[in-house]
């Protein structure tokens, strides 16, 4: 699988505390291009409020993930652990995987405004005492 199309917020990376900068729509990308070129390698590529996500190969075969209530996701050729092993963003090709690492998130904490603070505003934190549920369906194309 190489190609990705989703109905959700995009086209750029967006998180709970930055999703207002991204519009709802249908967006497409090569999975490789979902990475961000940060100076320091780090977790990246989140997209929010996706109602559906489609992955296809060059022949049109693939899968569709449907989440009517919305789901957040990232699809990269790296695990977070891979990214933590490289110092600089331009070194990410050194840990590039052939497979797609797909994260489906019920909720994710906001990322704040700077690498060294301040922390996200309270409404973008995750309440530890709250219960969170989500559902999704995966089907072949």
Place the predicted regions along the sequence by residue.
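Beta-strand/loop-rich accessory regions of lumenal/periplasmic or secreted enzymes
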Residues: 1-141
